[in-house]
Regions:
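Claisen-condensing/thiolase-fold acyl-transfer catalytic domains that form or cleave C-C bonds
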Residues: 2-5, 67, 71-74, 97-98, ...
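Phosphate/pyrophosphate-binding loops at sites that engage ATP/ADP/AMP, CoA/4′-phosphopantetheine
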Residues: 73-89, 241-258, 306-311
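Anion-binding (especially nucleotide phosphate/pyrophosphate-binding) glycine-rich loop
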Residues: 80, 84-116
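Short acidic, glycine/serine/threonine-rich loops at helix termini
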Residues: 31-32, 102-104, 161-165, 329-333
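Acidic-glycine-rich active-site phosphate/pyrophosphate-binding loop
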Residues: 41-50, 100-114, 151-157, 210-217, ...
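Short beta-strand segments
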Residues: 21-24, 94, 124, 149-155, ...
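Flexible, glycine-rich active-site loops centered on histidine and acidic residues
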Residues: 142-175
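Condensing-enzyme catalytic core mediating Claisen C-C bond formation in acyl metabolism
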Residues: 2-62, 165-233, 237, 241, ...
Length: 356
């Protein structure tokens, strides 16, 4: 399998000052505990928690879909930052569980939050999708195709997971996060991206629901299938390699990182990645125990939580890493711009002129 060091974007010059200036999140009200699975699966709270680190997760209602997760996350963003949607000219949604193959979930979200006319499209990279979408949004602003991007990571994984399969049912949850990506003052924002994929491992994690891929007369297979052992080995290796590559590209070392925000898939994967970095769990944001694996929404949910409780401070160095179906991986370094601390500043006057 190709190494992340050979991934796209590795040799790009320093990025212009573009970062996150607003954020919001949403998790459904329906809390599903490990004890709930004991009612219909051969499992227990102790068995699930010891192997995954998950205690509970949230499930969307029967009539709620991924666009609903995204819209509610955007509504939370607007509650926090009332003028955040002004001037948004592009909407990007990272999701592996879209409402439909088309129209895009991004288009549905845009229409429901009053952004009709904005460019809107989805990014499909499974659990790596949020990091991929950050790179896409950053590129839209840097290249002049947009001035302000609404980035959403949202999923309803409960609808594409077989709830009778112990190997996958216990892992996944639903939720969404929303962010504004735009120019920020010099010294803040995204510093590096490392993205990659290798379809040699595609059969280890997939949802095959496209009719023409099935043998004649075969039933549709709408549920996620996963080879947990293979995904675990891949994840531990690629998180370490892509994280180091992103830091190297930004001129950073592990000691420069204030917070690691990893994709929340399994506590054992996170612990193994931390060991490879030589990074303490105390410097790692983990909320897996309460939300499970929400795929492209895990990093937004974790980032917002750590920002809300005061762990993430203005100017701190963040490292975000994800892996997922493809098999894919993505890592980015980010100097955090605290939108509340800088509220009311003339951001446009402070930001450097964008040059690609």
């Amino acid at each position: 399998m190709p190494q992340p060091e050979g991934s796209a974007l590795l040799s790009r010059p320093a990025l212009p000052a573009i970062g996150i200036t607003a954020l919001g999140v949403y998790a459904p009200e329906n809390v599903v505990t490990n004890a709930d699975f004991e009612q219909h699966l051969d499992t227990s709270d102790e068995w699930i928690f010891s192997r995954t680190g998950i205690r509970e997760r949230r499930f969307a209602a029967e009539n709620e879909y991924t666009s609903h997760m995204g819209v509610r996350a955007v509504q939370d963003l607007v509650r926090r930052f009332p003028h955040a949607l002004e001037g948004v000219d592009a909407v990007v949604c990272a999701t592996g569980s879209p409402d439909a193959l088309f129209p895009s979930t991004a288009a549905l979200i845009a229409g429901q939050v009053g952004l009709r006319g904005a460019a809107a499209f989805d990014v499909s990279a499974a659990c790596s999708g949020f990091v991929y979408a950050c790179s896409v949004a950053q590129g839209l602003v840097a290249g002049g195709s947009a001035r302000k991007v609404l980035l959403v990571g949202a999923e309803t994984m409960s609808k594409i997971v077989d709830q009778t399969d112990r190997g996958t049912a216990i892992l996944f949850g639903d939720g969404g996060g929303a962010m504004i990506i735009e120019a920020v003052p010099s010294g803040y924002g995204f510093e590096s991206f490392v993205l990659g994929a290798d379809s040699a491992g595609a059969e280890s994690l997939y949802v095959r629901c496209v009719a023409h891929q099935l043998p004649s007369g075969a039933a549709m297979q709408p549920y996620l299938a996963m080879n947990g052992r293979e995904v675990f080995k891949f994840a531990v290796r690629v998180m370490g390699e892509s994280g180091h590559a992103a830091m190297q590209k930004a001129g950073l070392s592990v000691k420069d990182v204030d917070w690691l925000i990893p994709h929340q898939a399994n506590i054992r994967i996170i612990e193994s990645a931390c060991q490879r970095f030589g990074l303490s769990l105390d410097k790692t944001v983990v909320n897996l125990d309460r939300y499970g694996n929400t795929s492209a929404a895990t990093i937004p949910l974790a980032l917002a939580e750590a920002y809300d409780d005061g762990r993430i401070q203005d100017g701190q160095q963040l490292l975000m890493i994800a892996f997922g179906g493809g098999l894919s991986w993505g890592a980015t370094t980010l100097k955090w711009y605290d939108p509340l601390k800088h509220a009311g500043t003339a951001q446009a006057d402070q930001a450097l002129e964008l040059q690609v």
